[in-house]
Amino acid sequence: MGVIIIAAIGRKSEIGKGNDLLWKLPNDMKFFKEKTLGHAVIMGRKTYESIPKKYRPLKDRLNIVISSNNKYEEEGVVMAKSPSDALKIAENSDYDQVFVIGGASIYENLIDKINKMYITEVAASFDDADVFFPENWYKDIVVKNKILRQEVDEKHEYAFTIFEVEKQ
């Protein structure tokens, strides 16, 4: 089974503030949907709750939500107690790929288990960010493909580039 991280990060590895994204990038969201559709997705409870209610659970995907709260339940998701538990659930499913979609502690716990990442590098810094992608994430990776370069336009406040990278 392929375990893949998909994340958008700022220049200083910023990924969020106050349980929300720091940007609205429709073409990045479109890429996210295209890549994850039909696969399993692993996320922490806060990431799940940050998804607008009308979009959750994410349609046409196995939603695996990690929470240490045994009483936390959501319709349409499979609950996991830990990142390793979430991986076991994904491995025992019929899905051939699992995407790790956040948040920071989930990325941190699973970054050594992945073989590929789709990283959206947002061409901006966000001093008010309070959530960050793991430090040194770029160690032991090779850029395989530059997938998309988006310039600033009426729908995109920030330029960004999406890369496919592989772990060595």
Where are these regions (language model features)?
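Enzymes that bind and transform nitrogen-containing heteroaromatic metabolites
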Residues: 1-168
